[in-house]
């Protein structure tokens, strides 16, 4: 009887072991399927628009010194703007006068004639006014020379050619117009500190202008427009 019970116990033990092993094998087969990772990939999109602003806007200018109406003289002034844009294609800037001639007398109806370059569409490298007259003109300089519109670039002797900005205050003089004139053509975004443009103005009256330029205070109202391209 002892031997029989031992055999029965052994069979039971073996059966239990087989069942346990079977369950373990089932777990090994099923569990990897249950524990595999799955992925769900997606994107988040945010659009950022281009903007442009004046970090520093142009200020009003008082030309200096005053000019004697008969003996004549030369007067200068300047203003500066700083433009900031994140537009990858950069920006353009134009200048336009509100009247023609641009420099109008505040009283009496007089005016100072616009500058007359030797070629109607090309600035003069030097500011030159003929005898017995007076004229008002402007020039443009940029902190990044390549930003300048081509007509304000020079080859050290002639404007609208070359890639230099020679002499700044002494080069590439042009006449204000009631038609917008391109001054800046930048092709990249600016740094956070912006891009600087300086505009110089000059009035020169030669001796005994004819017709006479009446005694008055003269004002030219101009507008700069910067546009993201």
Regions found by a protein language model. Name each.
Residues 1-39:
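Sec-dependent, cleavable N-terminal signal peptides
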Residues 31-229:
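Signature of Gram-negative chaperone-usher
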């Amino acid at each position: 009887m002892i031997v029989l019970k031992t055999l029965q116990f052994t069979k039971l033990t073996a059966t239990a072991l087989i069942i346990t092993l079977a369950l373990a094998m089932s777990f090994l087969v099923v569990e990897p399927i249950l524990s595999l990772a799955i992925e769900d990939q997606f994107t988040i999109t945010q659009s950022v628009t281009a903007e442009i602003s004046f970090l520093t806007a142009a200020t009003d200018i008082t030309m200096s010194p005053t000019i004697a109406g008969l003996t004549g003289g030369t007067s200068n002034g300047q203003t500066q703007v700083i433009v900031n844009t994140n537009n990858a294609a950069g920006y353009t800037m134009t200048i336009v006068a509100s009247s023609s001639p641009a420099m109008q007398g505040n009283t009496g109806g007089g005016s100072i004639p616009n500058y007359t370059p030797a070629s109607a569409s090309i600035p003069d490298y030097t500011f030159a006014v003929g005898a017995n007259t007076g004229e008002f003109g402007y020039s443009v300089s940029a902190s990044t020379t390549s930003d300048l519109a081509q007509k304000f670039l020079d080859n050290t002797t002639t404007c609208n050619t070359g890639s230099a900005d020679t002499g700044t205050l002494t080069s590439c003089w042009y006449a204000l117009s009631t038609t917008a004139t391109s001054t800046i053509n930048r092709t990249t975004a600016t740094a956070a500190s912006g891009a600087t443009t300086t505009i110089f103005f000059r009035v020169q009256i030669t001796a005994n202008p004819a017709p006479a330029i009446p005694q008055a205070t003269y004002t030219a109202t101009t507008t700069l427009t910067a546009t993201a391209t």
